[in-house]
Protein backbone atom coordinates (compact mmCIF):
# COMPACT_ATOMS: atom_id res chain seq x y z
CA UNK A 1 0.00 0.00 0.00
CA UNK A 2 2.99 2.25 -0.60
CA UNK A 3 2.11 5.81 -1.51
CA UNK A 4 -1.50 5.64 -0.31
CA UNK A 5 -3.45 7.08 2.62
CA UNK A 6 -5.31 4.43 4.66
CA UNK A 7 -8.31 4.94 6.98
CA UNK A 8 -10.58 2.56 8.95
CA UNK A 9 -13.22 0.70 6.99
CA UNK A 10 -16.30 2.45 8.47
CA UNK A 11 -19.36 3.94 6.84
CA UNK A 12 -18.20 7.42 7.67
CA UNK A 13 -18.17 10.48 5.46
CA UNK A 14 -15.31 12.83 6.19
CA UNK A 15 -14.81 16.42 5.14
CA UNK A 16 -12.12 18.95 5.84
CA UNK A 17 -13.29 21.79 8.06
CA UNK A 18 -10.85 24.54 9.04
CA UNK A 19 -7.94 22.22 8.57
CA UNK A 20 -9.47 19.41 10.66
CA UNK A 21 -11.69 16.43 10.08
CA UNK A 22 -15.28 16.58 11.24
CA UNK A 23 -17.57 13.58 11.30
CA UNK A 24 -21.01 13.91 9.77
CA UNK A 25 -22.29 12.24 12.94
CA UNK A 26 -21.38 15.40 14.84
CA UNK A 27 -23.51 17.43 12.44
CA UNK A 28 -26.43 15.05 12.96
CA UNK A 29 -26.02 15.25 16.74
CA UNK A 30 -25.98 19.06 16.66
CA UNK A 31 -29.07 19.14 14.45
CA UNK A 32 -30.94 16.76 16.76
CA UNK A 33 -29.98 18.77 19.82
CA UNK A 34 -31.27 21.95 18.20
CA UNK A 35 -34.49 20.17 17.23
CA UNK A 36 -35.04 18.91 20.80
CA UNK A 37 -34.35 22.38 22.19
CA UNK A 38 -36.94 23.90 19.84
CA UNK A 39 -39.49 21.23 20.73
CA UNK A 40 -38.99 21.79 24.45
CA UNK A 41 -39.40 25.53 23.99
CA UNK A 42 -42.67 24.90 22.19
CA UNK A 43 -43.66 22.47 24.94
CA UNK A 44 -43.09 25.07 27.65
CA UNK A 45 -45.14 27.61 25.71
CA UNK A 46 -48.07 25.21 25.32
CA UNK A 47 -47.91 24.16 28.96
CA UNK A 48 -47.99 27.79 30.04
CA UNK A 49 -50.99 28.43 27.79
CA UNK A 50 -52.75 25.36 29.21
CA UNK A 51 -52.13 26.53 32.78
CA UNK A 52 -53.56 29.97 32.02
CA UNK A 53 -56.68 28.46 30.45
CA UNK A 54 -57.12 26.10 33.40
CA UNK A 55 -56.79 28.93 35.92
CA UNK A 56 -59.38 30.96 34.02
CA UNK A 57 -61.70 27.98 33.90
CA UNK A 58 -61.44 27.31 37.63
CA UNK A 59 -61.86 30.99 38.48
CA UNK A 60 -64.90 31.14 36.23
CA UNK A 61 -66.41 28.12 37.91
CA UNK A 62 -65.26 29.35 41.30
CA UNK A 63 -62.07 28.78 43.28
CA UNK A 64 -64.27 27.29 46.02
CA UNK A 65 -66.66 24.83 44.43
CA UNK A 66 -69.40 22.88 46.20
CA UNK A 67 -70.77 19.59 44.89
CA UNK A 68 -73.58 17.52 46.34
CA UNK A 69 -73.84 13.74 46.18
CA UNK A 70 -77.02 11.87 47.11
CA UNK A 71 -76.48 8.52 48.75
CA UNK A 72 -78.43 5.59 47.23
CA UNK A 73 -81.35 4.34 49.29
CA UNK A 74 -80.42 1.57 51.70
CA UNK A 75 -83.82 0.49 53.05
CA UNK A 76 -86.13 -1.46 50.73
CA UNK A 77 -89.09 0.58 51.97
CA UNK A 78 -87.60 3.76 50.54
CA UNK A 79 -87.92 2.41 47.00
CA UNK A 80 -91.67 2.15 47.46
CA UNK A 81 -92.10 5.70 48.74
CA UNK A 82 -91.32 8.94 47.02
CA UNK A 83 -88.10 10.58 48.19
CA UNK A 84 -88.41 14.08 49.66
CA UNK A 85 -85.25 15.07 47.77
CA UNK A 86 -85.56 16.14 44.13
CA UNK A 87 -82.37 16.49 42.14
CA UNK A 88 -81.64 18.73 39.15
CA UNK A 89 -78.35 19.58 37.44
CA UNK A 90 -77.35 22.39 39.82
CA UNK A 91 -80.28 22.47 42.20
CA UNK A 92 -81.68 20.34 45.02
CA UNK A 93 -85.25 20.68 46.25
CA UNK A 94 -86.22 19.30 49.67
CA UNK A 95 -89.93 18.88 50.38
CA UNK A 96 -91.41 18.17 53.78
CA UNK A 97 -94.80 18.71 55.41
CA UNK A 98 -95.62 22.28 54.44
CA UNK A 99 -91.98 23.03 53.64
CA UNK A 100 -90.13 23.39 50.32
CA UNK A 101 -86.52 24.50 50.24
CA UNK A 102 -84.21 24.94 47.27
CA UNK A 103 -80.42 24.83 47.40
CA UNK A 104 -78.03 25.66 44.56
CA UNK A 105 -74.64 24.04 44.19
CA UNK A 106 -72.06 23.78 41.41
CA UNK A 107 -72.87 20.17 40.53
CA UNK A 108 -75.28 17.49 41.79
CA UNK A 109 -74.59 13.74 41.63
CA UNK A 110 -77.75 11.69 41.92
CA UNK A 111 -78.16 8.21 43.37
CA UNK A 112 -77.08 6.51 40.11
CA UNK A 113 -73.79 8.41 39.86
CA UNK A 114 -70.59 6.37 39.96
CA UNK A 115 -67.16 6.90 41.45
CA UNK A 116 -65.85 7.67 37.97
CA UNK A 117 -68.46 10.40 37.47
CA UNK A 118 -67.36 12.13 40.64
CA UNK A 119 -63.67 11.82 39.84
CA UNK A 120 -64.06 13.35 36.37
CA UNK A 121 -65.15 16.59 38.05
CA UNK A 122 -62.19 16.39 40.42
CA UNK A 123 -59.56 15.91 37.68
CA UNK A 124 -59.18 19.58 36.65
CA UNK A 125 -58.39 20.66 40.18
CA UNK A 126 -55.70 17.95 40.39
CA UNK A 127 -53.99 19.53 37.39
CA UNK A 128 -53.84 22.77 39.35
CA UNK A 129 -51.97 20.91 42.10
CA UNK A 130 -49.45 19.67 39.54
CA UNK A 131 -49.11 23.23 38.21
CA UNK A 132 -48.02 24.48 41.64
CA UNK A 133 -51.26 25.50 43.40
CA UNK A 134 -52.29 24.26 46.83
CA UNK A 135 -55.48 22.21 46.55
CA UNK A 136 -57.94 21.00 49.18
CA UNK A 137 -60.70 18.43 48.56
CA UNK A 138 -63.13 17.83 51.43
CA UNK A 139 -65.93 15.33 51.99
CA UNK A 140 -68.64 16.69 54.31
CA UNK A 141 -71.93 15.30 55.48
CA UNK A 142 -74.00 13.44 58.01
CA UNK A 143 -72.74 10.20 59.52
CA UNK A 144 -73.57 7.29 57.23
CA UNK A 145 -74.09 9.25 53.99
CA UNK A 146 -71.04 7.84 52.18
CA UNK A 147 -68.21 10.31 52.80
CA UNK A 148 -65.61 7.59 53.39
CA UNK A 149 -66.92 5.64 50.40
CA UNK A 150 -66.46 8.68 48.16
CA UNK A 151 -62.93 9.34 49.42
CA UNK A 152 -61.62 5.78 49.85
CA UNK A 153 -64.01 3.46 47.99
CA UNK A 154 -64.48 -0.26 48.58
CA UNK A 155 -64.85 -3.60 46.79
CA UNK A 156 -62.73 -2.51 43.85
CA UNK A 157 -64.59 0.78 43.41
CA UNK A 158 -61.77 3.20 44.09
CA UNK A 159 -62.51 6.54 45.69
CA UNK A 160 -61.07 9.99 45.12
CA UNK A 161 -57.86 9.46 47.13
CA UNK A 162 -56.49 6.34 45.37
CA UNK A 163 -57.64 7.66 42.00
CA UNK A 164 -55.96 11.01 42.64
CA UNK A 165 -52.67 9.31 43.56
CA UNK A 166 -52.89 7.22 40.41
CA UNK A 167 -53.60 10.31 38.29
CA UNK A 168 -50.60 12.15 39.74
CA UNK A 169 -48.18 9.34 38.88
CA UNK A 170 -49.75 8.87 35.46
CA UNK A 171 -49.35 12.54 34.54
CA UNK A 172 -45.81 12.69 35.93
CA UNK A 173 -44.75 9.74 33.74
CA UNK A 174 -46.18 11.39 30.61
CA UNK A 175 -44.80 14.89 31.19
CA UNK A 176 -41.25 14.93 29.84
CA UNK A 177 -40.84 18.69 30.35
CA UNK A 178 -40.81 18.48 34.16
CA UNK A 179 -39.54 16.21 36.90
CA UNK A 180 -41.90 15.39 39.76
CA UNK A 181 -41.37 13.91 43.20
CA UNK A 182 -44.12 12.97 45.65
CA UNK A 183 -44.35 12.34 49.37
CA UNK A 184 -47.29 11.33 51.55
CA UNK A 185 -48.34 12.21 55.09
CA UNK A 186 -51.47 11.25 57.03
CA UNK A 187 -52.88 12.64 60.24
CA UNK A 188 -56.14 12.88 62.11
CA UNK A 189 -57.65 15.63 64.22
CA UNK A 190 -59.16 13.77 67.15
CA UNK A 191 -60.92 15.85 69.80
CA UNK A 192 -58.75 18.88 69.09
CA UNK A 193 -55.49 16.88 69.06
CA UNK A 194 -53.36 16.14 66.00
CA UNK A 195 -52.14 12.54 65.59
CA UNK A 196 -49.73 11.09 63.07
CA UNK A 197 -51.26 8.05 61.36
CA UNK A 198 -48.03 6.79 59.75
CA UNK A 199 -46.13 6.25 63.01
CA UNK A 200 -46.05 2.77 64.58
CA UNK A 201 -49.56 1.60 65.32
CA UNK A 202 -51.15 2.88 68.51
CA UNK A 203 -53.21 0.70 70.90
CA UNK A 204 -56.57 -0.33 69.44
CA UNK A 205 -58.62 1.22 72.24
CA UNK A 206 -59.42 4.92 72.16
CA UNK A 207 -58.26 7.15 74.95
CA UNK A 208 -58.69 10.79 75.81
CA UNK A 209 -54.95 10.94 76.48
CA UNK A 210 -52.89 10.56 73.38
CA UNK A 211 -49.38 9.26 73.25
CA UNK A 212 -46.85 12.03 73.76
CA UNK A 213 -44.67 10.63 70.98
CA UNK A 214 -47.48 11.24 68.46
CA UNK A 215 -48.18 14.87 69.46
CA UNK A 216 -47.20 17.27 66.69
CA UNK A 217 -47.34 21.05 66.50
CA UNK A 218 -48.50 23.47 63.81
CA UNK A 219 -46.17 26.29 62.77
CA UNK A 220 -46.76 29.17 60.37
CA UNK A 221 -43.95 30.86 58.42
CA UNK A 222 -43.71 34.56 57.60
CA UNK A 223 -44.84 33.87 54.04
CA UNK A 224 -48.03 32.26 55.34
CA UNK A 225 -47.05 28.66 54.66
CA UNK A 226 -47.99 26.10 57.29
CA UNK A 227 -45.52 23.51 58.57
CA UNK A 228 -46.68 20.57 60.67
CA UNK A 229 -43.66 19.90 62.87
CA UNK A 230 -42.99 16.25 63.68
CA UNK A 231 -45.32 14.86 61.01
CA UNK A 232 -44.05 11.78 59.17
CA UNK A 233 -43.42 12.53 55.49
CA UNK A 234 -42.66 9.45 53.37
CA UNK A 235 -41.24 9.75 49.85
CA UNK A 236 -43.16 7.59 47.38
CA UNK A 237 -41.44 6.57 44.15
CA UNK A 238 -44.25 4.49 42.65
CA UNK A 239 -47.97 3.85 42.90
CA UNK A 240 -47.59 0.58 44.78
CA UNK A 241 -45.68 2.17 47.67
CA UNK A 242 -48.13 5.07 47.79
CA UNK A 243 -51.11 2.73 48.14
CA UNK A 244 -49.33 0.71 50.83
CA UNK A 245 -48.70 3.78 52.98
CA UNK A 246 -52.21 5.10 52.41
CA UNK A 247 -53.79 1.80 53.49
CA UNK A 248 -51.57 1.75 56.56
CA UNK A 249 -52.68 5.23 57.58
CA UNK A 250 -56.40 4.75 57.12
CA UNK A 251 -56.33 1.53 59.17
CA UNK A 252 -54.97 3.54 62.10
CA UNK A 253 -57.87 5.99 62.07
CA UNK A 254 -60.19 6.23 65.10
CA UNK A 255 -63.64 4.69 64.51
CA UNK A 256 -66.58 3.64 66.68
CA UNK A 257 -70.09 2.19 66.55
CA UNK A 258 -73.18 4.40 66.76
CA UNK A 259 -76.90 3.94 66.20
CA UNK A 260 -76.52 5.48 62.74
CA UNK A 261 -73.33 3.78 61.51
CA UNK A 262 -71.59 0.57 62.49
CA UNK A 263 -68.16 2.01 61.64
CA UNK A 264 -68.38 5.73 62.33
CA UNK A 265 -65.32 7.93 61.94
CA UNK A 266 -64.64 9.73 65.19
CA UNK A 267 -62.07 12.16 63.77
CA UNK A 268 -61.12 14.15 60.70
CA UNK A 269 -58.69 12.21 58.49
CA UNK A 270 -56.29 14.34 56.43
CA UNK A 271 -54.07 12.92 53.68
CA UNK A 272 -51.38 15.26 52.34
CA UNK A 273 -49.57 14.68 49.06
CA UNK A 274 -46.56 17.00 48.71
CA UNK A 275 -45.67 17.65 45.07
CA UNK A 276 -42.26 18.98 44.03
CA UNK A 277 -41.81 20.00 40.44
CA UNK A 278 -38.68 21.15 38.60
CA UNK A 279 -38.67 22.27 34.97
CA UNK A 280 -35.24 22.56 33.38
CA UNK A 281 -33.12 25.21 35.07
CA UNK A 282 -36.01 26.92 36.85
CA UNK A 283 -36.43 26.81 40.59
CA UNK A 284 -38.28 23.93 42.20
CA UNK A 285 -41.99 24.46 42.86
CA UNK A 286 -43.69 22.88 45.85
CA UNK A 287 -47.44 22.42 46.28
CA UNK A 288 -49.73 20.48 48.59
CA UNK A 289 -52.78 18.39 47.86
CA UNK A 290 -55.01 17.84 50.90
CA UNK A 291 -57.60 15.05 50.72
CA UNK A 292 -59.84 15.38 53.77
CA UNK A 293 -62.45 12.92 55.01
CA UNK A 294 -64.30 14.97 57.62
CA UNK A 295 -66.01 13.45 60.60
CA UNK A 296 -69.77 13.13 60.28
CA UNK A 297 -72.02 15.89 61.53
CA UNK A 298 -74.56 14.29 63.84
CA UNK A 299 -77.32 14.91 66.32
CA UNK A 300 -76.69 13.37 69.71
CA UNK A 301 -80.33 12.36 70.20
CA UNK A 302 -80.29 10.38 66.96
CA UNK A 303 -76.90 8.71 67.34
CA UNK A 304 -77.54 7.76 70.96
CA UNK A 305 -73.95 8.63 71.80
CA UNK A 306 -72.82 8.92 75.38
CA UNK A 307 -69.62 9.25 77.31
CA UNK A 308 -66.50 9.36 75.13
CA UNK A 309 -68.47 8.94 71.90
CA UNK A 310 -70.60 11.96 72.78
CA UNK A 311 -67.47 14.05 73.45
CA UNK A 312 -66.06 13.00 70.08
CA UNK A 313 -69.27 14.08 68.35
CA UNK A 314 -69.17 17.48 70.03
CA UNK A 315 -65.54 18.02 68.98
CA UNK A 316 -66.38 17.09 65.39
CA UNK A 317 -69.31 19.51 65.25
CA UNK A 318 -67.22 22.36 66.68
CA UNK A 319 -64.45 21.94 64.12
CA UNK A 320 -66.99 21.67 61.27
CA UNK A 321 -68.59 24.92 62.40
CA UNK A 322 -65.16 26.61 62.41
CA UNK A 323 -64.52 25.29 58.90
CA UNK A 324 -67.81 26.76 57.71
CA UNK A 325 -66.86 30.15 59.16
CA UNK A 326 -63.51 30.11 57.35
CA UNK A 327 -64.97 29.15 53.97
CA UNK A 328 -67.73 31.75 54.27
CA UNK A 329 -65.18 34.48 55.10
CA UNK A 330 -63.06 33.48 52.12
CA UNK A 331 -66.00 33.51 49.71
CA UNK A 332 -67.04 36.94 50.95
CA UNK A 333 -63.41 38.14 50.82
CA UNK A 334 -63.36 39.41 54.36
CA UNK A 335 -60.20 40.99 55.76
CA UNK A 336 -60.10 38.61 58.71
CA UNK A 337 -60.38 34.84 58.29
CA UNK A 338 -60.72 32.90 61.59
CA UNK A 339 -58.21 30.12 60.89
CA UNK A 340 -57.12 29.75 64.51
CA UNK A 341 -60.54 28.73 65.81
CA UNK A 342 -59.78 25.08 65.10
CA UNK A 343 -56.81 22.74 64.58
CA UNK A 344 -58.42 21.62 61.34
CA UNK A 345 -58.61 25.10 59.80
CA UNK A 346 -55.20 26.00 61.20
CA UNK A 347 -53.59 23.10 59.33
CA UNK A 348 -55.46 23.88 56.10
CA UNK A 349 -54.99 27.66 56.25
CA UNK A 350 -52.45 27.86 53.37
CA UNK A 351 -54.62 25.55 51.23
CA UNK A 352 -57.91 27.41 51.68
CA UNK A 353 -56.80 31.01 51.08
CA UNK A 354 -55.77 33.08 48.08
CA UNK A 355 -54.17 31.20 45.21
CA UNK A 356 -55.58 27.88 46.42
CA UNK A 357 -58.33 25.73 44.95
CA UNK A 358 -61.02 24.22 47.20
CA UNK A 359 -63.57 21.56 46.36
CA UNK A 360 -66.18 20.35 48.84
CA UNK A 361 -68.44 17.35 48.24
CA UNK A 362 -71.50 17.52 50.52
CA UNK A 363 -73.23 14.17 51.11
CA UNK A 364 -76.92 13.84 51.91
CA UNK A 365 -79.42 11.02 52.45
CA UNK A 366 -82.65 10.65 50.42
CA UNK A 367 -84.50 9.12 53.37
CA UNK A 368 -87.48 10.75 55.11
CA UNK A 369 -85.87 9.95 58.44
CA UNK A 370 -82.86 12.12 57.63
CA UNK A 371 -84.61 15.26 56.39
CA UNK A 372 -83.36 17.32 59.32
CA UNK A 373 -79.71 16.31 58.75
CA UNK A 374 -80.13 16.81 55.00
CA UNK A 375 -81.36 20.38 55.47
CA UNK A 376 -78.48 21.11 57.87
CA UNK A 377 -75.87 19.77 55.43
CA UNK A 378 -77.32 21.73 52.50
CA UNK A 379 -77.44 24.87 54.63
CA UNK A 380 -73.74 24.39 55.32
CA UNK A 381 -73.12 24.04 51.57
CA UNK A 382 -75.15 27.17 50.90
CA UNK A 383 -73.16 29.07 53.48
CA UNK A 384 -69.87 27.89 52.03
CA UNK A 385 -70.97 28.79 48.53
CA UNK A 386 -72.34 32.14 49.78
CA UNK A 387 -74.92 32.45 46.99
CA UNK A 388 -78.56 33.09 47.86
CA UNK A 389 -81.16 31.16 45.88
CA UNK A 390 -83.08 34.38 45.24
CA UNK A 391 -80.02 35.96 43.65
CA UNK A 392 -79.37 33.44 40.91
CA UNK A 393 -77.79 34.59 37.68
CA UNK A 394 -80.01 35.42 34.72
CA UNK A 395 -80.40 32.93 31.89
CA UNK A 396 -78.42 35.09 29.44
CA UNK A 397 -75.47 35.38 31.80
CA UNK A 398 -75.61 31.66 32.47
CA UNK A 399 -75.49 30.94 28.73
CA UNK A 400 -72.51 33.25 28.26
CA UNK A 401 -70.78 31.61 31.18
CA UNK A 402 -71.40 28.13 29.81
CA UNK A 403 -70.15 29.20 26.38
CA UNK A 404 -66.95 30.60 27.85
CA UNK A 405 -66.45 27.45 29.91
CA UNK A 406 -66.87 25.33 26.77
CA UNK A 407 -64.30 27.47 24.92
CA UNK A 408 -61.78 27.12 27.73
CA UNK A 409 -62.40 23.38 27.91
CA UNK A 410 -61.70 23.07 24.19
CA UNK A 411 -58.57 25.20 24.48
CA UNK A 412 -57.29 23.00 27.31
CA UNK A 413 -58.06 19.81 25.38
CA UNK A 414 -56.31 21.11 22.25
CA UNK A 415 -53.25 22.16 24.26
CA UNK A 416 -53.10 18.80 26.01
CA UNK A 417 -53.35 16.91 22.71
CA UNK A 418 -50.61 19.03 21.16
CA UNK A 419 -48.48 18.50 24.26
CA UNK A 420 -48.99 14.77 23.90
CA UNK A 421 -47.85 14.89 20.26
CA UNK A 422 -44.84 17.01 21.23
CA UNK A 423 -43.88 14.50 23.90
CA UNK A 424 -43.88 11.74 21.29
CA UNK A 425 -41.72 13.85 18.96
CA UNK A 426 -39.29 14.60 21.77
CA UNK A 427 -39.04 10.92 22.67
CA UNK A 428 -38.30 9.97 19.06
CA UNK A 429 -35.71 12.73 18.73
CA UNK A 430 -34.03 11.73 22.00
CA UNK A 431 -33.91 8.09 20.87
CA UNK A 432 -32.27 9.12 17.57
CA UNK A 433 -29.84 11.33 19.47
CA UNK A 434 -28.77 8.45 21.71
CA UNK A 435 -28.25 6.23 18.66
CA UNK A 436 -26.12 8.88 16.93
CA UNK A 437 -24.04 9.38 20.06
CA UNK A 438 -23.43 5.64 20.39
CA UNK A 439 -22.47 5.36 16.72
CA UNK A 440 -20.14 8.36 16.97
CA UNK A 441 -18.57 6.97 20.13
CA UNK A 442 -18.04 3.59 18.44
CA UNK A 443 -16.46 5.26 15.41
CA UNK A 444 -14.10 7.32 17.57
CA UNK A 445 -13.16 4.24 19.54
CA UNK A 446 -12.46 2.36 16.31
CA UNK A 447 -10.24 5.19 15.06
CA UNK A 448 -8.39 5.22 18.37
CA UNK A 449 -7.89 1.45 18.32
CA UNK A 450 -6.72 1.40 14.70
CA UNK A 451 -4.12 4.08 15.29
CA UNK A 452 -0.82 2.18 15.31
CA UNK A 453 -2.54 -1.21 14.93
CA UNK A 454 -1.17 -2.99 11.80
CA UNK A 455 -3.85 -5.65 11.96
CA UNK A 456 -6.79 -3.25 11.73
CA UNK A 457 -9.12 -3.48 8.75
CA UNK A 458 -8.09 -0.64 6.45
CA UNK A 459 -9.24 0.69 3.10
CA UNK A 460 -7.49 2.91 0.54
CA UNK A 461 -9.37 6.16 -0.02
CA UNK A 462 -6.80 8.18 -1.90
CA UNK A 463 -3.34 8.14 -3.56
CA UNK A 464 -0.43 10.40 -2.80
CA UNK A 465 2.56 10.65 -5.08
CA UNK A 466 5.77 9.73 -3.31
CA UNK A 467 7.59 12.58 -5.01
CA UNK A 468 5.16 15.05 -3.43
CA UNK A 469 5.75 13.82 0.11
CA UNK A 470 9.12 12.01 0.29
CA UNK A 471 9.43 12.60 4.02
CA UNK A 472 6.15 10.83 4.77
CA UNK A 473 7.20 7.88 2.56
CA UNK A 474 10.58 7.67 4.24
CA UNK A 475 9.02 7.76 7.71
CA UNK A 476 6.52 5.06 6.73
CA UNK A 477 9.27 2.79 5.40
CA UNK A 478 11.48 3.53 8.36
CA UNK A 479 8.72 2.48 10.77
CA UNK A 480 8.14 -0.67 8.70
CA UNK A 481 11.87 -1.49 8.77
CA UNK A 482 12.46 -0.88 12.44
CA UNK A 483 9.11 -1.91 13.85
CA UNK A 484 10.61 -5.20 15.10
CA UNK A 485 14.01 -3.79 16.19
CA UNK A 486 14.54 -3.11 19.91
CA UNK A 487 14.70 0.52 20.85
CA UNK A 488 18.37 0.47 21.85
CA UNK A 489 19.36 -1.10 18.48
CA UNK A 490 17.42 1.27 16.24
CA UNK A 491 19.46 3.88 14.32
CA UNK A 492 19.81 7.32 15.78
CA UNK A 493 19.21 10.60 13.98
CA UNK A 494 22.92 11.12 13.31
CA UNK A 495 23.37 7.63 11.93
CA UNK A 496 20.39 8.08 9.61
CA UNK A 497 21.90 11.34 8.34
CA UNK A 498 25.22 9.58 7.70
CA UNK A 499 23.39 6.81 5.88
CA UNK A 500 21.57 9.32 3.71
CA UNK A 501 24.73 11.24 2.77
CA UNK A 502 26.63 8.00 2.14
CA UNK A 503 23.87 6.70 -0.10
CA UNK A 504 23.87 9.95 -2.03
CA UNK A 505 27.66 9.79 -2.51
CA UNK A 506 27.50 6.15 -3.56
CA UNK A 507 24.84 7.01 -6.12
CA UNK A 508 27.02 9.67 -7.66
CA UNK A 509 29.95 7.26 -7.83
CA UNK A 510 27.84 4.63 -9.58
CA UNK A 511 26.59 7.22 -12.04
CA UNK A 512 30.16 8.26 -12.86
CA UNK A 513 31.18 4.70 -13.50
CA UNK A 514 28.16 4.06 -15.68
CA UNK A 515 28.94 7.13 -17.79
CA UNK A 516 32.49 5.98 -18.37
CA UNK A 517 31.17 2.72 -19.88
CA UNK A 518 29.42 4.50 -22.76
CA UNK A 519 31.45 5.24 -25.95
CA UNK A 520 32.29 8.79 -26.76
CA UNK A 521 30.20 8.66 -29.93
CA UNK A 522 27.08 8.06 -27.94
CA UNK A 523 27.72 11.26 -25.99
CA UNK A 524 28.26 13.46 -29.00
CA UNK A 525 25.82 16.23 -29.70
CA UNK A 526 24.79 17.56 -26.35
CA UNK A 527 27.58 15.75 -24.46
CA UNK A 528 25.18 15.35 -21.62
CA UNK A 529 22.46 12.97 -20.45
CA UNK A 530 19.54 13.20 -18.09
CA UNK A 531 19.38 11.74 -14.66
CA UNK A 532 16.21 9.85 -15.53
CA UNK A 533 18.13 7.37 -17.76
CA UNK A 534 20.54 6.61 -14.99
CA UNK A 535 17.64 6.37 -12.58
CA UNK A 536 15.98 3.70 -14.74
CA UNK A 537 19.20 1.71 -14.84
CA UNK A 538 19.57 2.05 -11.08
CA UNK A 539 16.03 0.81 -10.62
CA UNK A 540 16.72 -2.21 -12.77
CA UNK A 541 19.78 -3.11 -10.70
CA UNK A 542 17.78 -2.51 -7.52
CA UNK A 543 15.08 -4.94 -8.70
CA UNK A 544 17.69 -7.56 -9.50
CA UNK A 545 19.31 -7.09 -6.12
CA UNK A 546 15.92 -7.27 -4.36
CA UNK A 547 15.12 -10.56 -6.09
CA UNK A 548 18.35 -12.09 -4.82
CA UNK A 549 17.84 -10.70 -1.29
CA UNK A 550 14.03 -10.80 -0.67
CA UNK A 551 14.25 -10.10 3.01
CA UNK A 552 16.23 -6.86 2.69
CA UNK A 553 14.42 -3.55 2.54
CA UNK A 554 16.02 -0.33 1.28
CA UNK A 555 14.87 3.19 1.64
CA UNK A 556 13.81 4.89 -1.64
CA UNK A 557 16.27 7.18 -3.33
CA UNK A 558 15.38 10.83 -3.19
CA UNK A 559 17.10 13.34 -5.42
CA UNK A 560 16.20 16.17 -7.68
CA UNK A 561 16.59 15.77 -11.41
CA UNK A 562 20.24 16.67 -12.31
CA UNK A 563 21.86 17.39 -15.64
CA UNK A 564 25.58 16.81 -15.45
CA UNK A 565 28.21 17.26 -18.12
CA UNK A 566 30.99 14.77 -18.74
CA UNK A 567 33.65 17.05 -17.36
CA UNK A 568 31.76 17.83 -14.21
CA UNK A 569 31.21 14.14 -13.59
CA UNK A 570 34.90 13.38 -14.00
CA UNK A 571 35.94 16.22 -11.77
CA UNK A 572 33.44 15.22 -9.12
CA UNK A 573 34.58 11.63 -9.22
CA UNK A 574 38.20 12.69 -8.98
CA UNK A 575 37.74 15.19 -6.19
CA UNK A 576 35.20 13.23 -4.13
CA UNK A 577 36.80 12.05 -0.93
CA UNK A 578 36.66 8.37 -0.12
CA UNK A 579 34.03 7.79 2.52
CA UNK A 580 33.55 4.80 4.73
CA UNK A 581 30.72 2.74 3.22
CA UNK A 582 27.66 2.68 5.41
CA UNK A 583 24.47 0.63 5.23
CA UNK A 584 21.00 0.95 6.59
CA UNK A 585 20.26 -1.06 9.65
CA UNK A 586 18.38 -4.20 8.63
CA UNK A 587 16.87 -6.74 11.03
CA UNK A 588 18.06 -9.68 8.91
CA UNK A 589 21.68 -8.47 8.82
CA UNK A 590 22.16 -6.75 12.15
CA UNK A 591 25.19 -7.72 14.22
CA UNK A 592 24.90 -9.68 17.45
CA UNK A 593 24.30 -7.69 20.60
CA UNK A 594 27.89 -8.03 21.89
CA UNK A 595 29.32 -6.81 18.54
CA UNK A 596 27.15 -3.71 18.31
CA UNK A 597 29.23 -0.61 17.98
CA UNK A 598 27.09 1.46 20.42
CA UNK A 599 28.25 1.47 24.00
CA UNK A 600 26.17 -0.68 26.31
CA UNK A 601 26.83 1.72 29.18
CA UNK A 602 24.40 4.17 27.62
CA UNK A 603 21.55 1.72 28.25
CA UNK A 604 21.85 1.82 32.02
Swiss-Prot record:
The keyword Nucleotide-binding applies. It comes from the Eukaryota. GO terms for biological process: microtubule-based movement; spindle assembly. Keywords: ATP-binding, Coiled coil, Microtubule, Motor protein, Nucleotide-binding. ATP binds at residues 141-148. Residues 63-387 form the Kinesin motor domain. Residues 465-511, 565-604 are annotated as: Disordered. PANTHER family: KINESIN-LIKE PROTEIN KIN-14U, KINESIN-LIKE PROTEIN KLP-3. This is Kinesin-like protein KIN-14O. It comes from Oryza sativa subsp. japonica (Rice). The lineage of its organism: Eukaryota, Viridiplantae, Streptophyta, Embryophyta, Tracheophyta.
